[in-house]
Every structure is written in structure tokens, then in C-alpha cells.
Amino acid sequence: MTTIFDAFKLEGRVAVVTGGAGLLGREFSRTLAEAGAAVVVADIQAGAAEAVAADLTAQGYLALGVRLDVTDPALVQAMVETTLARFGRLDILVNSAALDPKFDPEALARGIVPGRFEDFPLDLWNQALAVNLTGVFLVTQACVQPMLAQGKGSIINICSTYGLNGPDQRIYVRADGQRVGYKPVYYTVTKAGVLGFTKYLAAYYAGTQIRVNA
């Protein structure tokens, strides 16, 4: 039976997925592996990254788990070097790492309401900019180097509809009538930034074999 993977075969390609052990990152990693790519599962949680990679390997796929803090240029460069040392190339980058208030234990522990702007802490704002925006810049800057050397590559930035429109807090109401804060200010701001970054790079690499999408 013909499957979608027959149209999108990735044998011989190497993909890096940042946030690869996260809710979305795990699925991106699995799908790329099923399509035939060797997958580098890069995540700030080293154990989780290794577990995802081990699961893929147990299924017969090529995968490697690597610890990556996208805000640390040295760790970003080390991840690229590890990828090249293990697989010899780097063809695909999926920028999936991001802070999301639903899964941010620090924010939850501090009792921060995701949608409340008036008292949103500056330190969490700065942290989100560092991870969600600067991290995408740093990882892309490092990964595009081997792509340029190879003459082709694909960069995929995970964005959101909230990068185009802010969440209307009025529609997020529980059955008991209590309004629930949904997505903090940084989420829309950083996702809009990622979209702008994608447009810039798509135009910048126009005419080359480097493709940039969101």
C-alpha cells in the first residue's frame, strides 16, 4: 500500500529536531525517522532526548539523543559538531524548542496566570525571548553552515496562529464561568518574531537550495 512516506522519502538525510523530547518534538522526530532520516533528538532534558532516541533506535531507525540548551552558543555548536561527527552531514533543521506556559514548571510553580499581562514577570519575559527567539537564531545560524557547504538544506520553524493574532482571553471560559488565562504575552510576541525571522531567511536564501518555512 502506498503511504505518504513514498512521496516524502528522506533516506540518506540527517535531521536535527530541537525540543525533540517535547510534546511536538517527539512526533516530529518519529515522523522524520519513519520517512527514513537519521534524527538528532536535541533537548535541554538530556535523559528525555536519549529516551526518545533509544525508542526510535529500538524500532530500527537511526537516532541520537543530545542535550541542547538553545540559548548557549557553545552547546549549539557542540550539537552541530556531534551531528556531523556521527552522521557526516546535516540536511534538515526543525526549530521546535520553545517555552510554552502549559508545560513551564517554573511559571506554574510561581502561580503565574498565563494570560495575565499586568503583573507578568520581567525575568520570565527575558527567558522566553532567549529561548523562543534568540535560540532559533543561534541554532539556525550554526546549522545552516553545513547546509551551505553541502549546497542544500531545509529549515523548518515551528510557529503558531498566535504569531498572527493575539489570543482573545474572553473565549477561554470554563464551564463554571471562570475565565482562564490562555497564553502569556511572550508567546504571541516570540511566535510573531519567528515568523518574521522565517520570512527574512526565506528571502535571504532565495535563489539557493536552502529552503526556509514555518
What does each model-found stretch correspond to?
Residues 46-47, 67-79, 122:
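The beta1-alpha1 cofactor-binding region of Rossmann-like NAD(H)/NADP(H)-dependent oxidoreductases
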Residues 160:
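Residue(s) in the substrate-gating loop at a strand-loop-helix junction
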Residues 145, 203-207:
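Alpha-helical segment proximal to the catalytic Tyr-Lys
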Residues 99, 111-137, 152, 156, ...:
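Catalytic Tyr-X3-Lys loop
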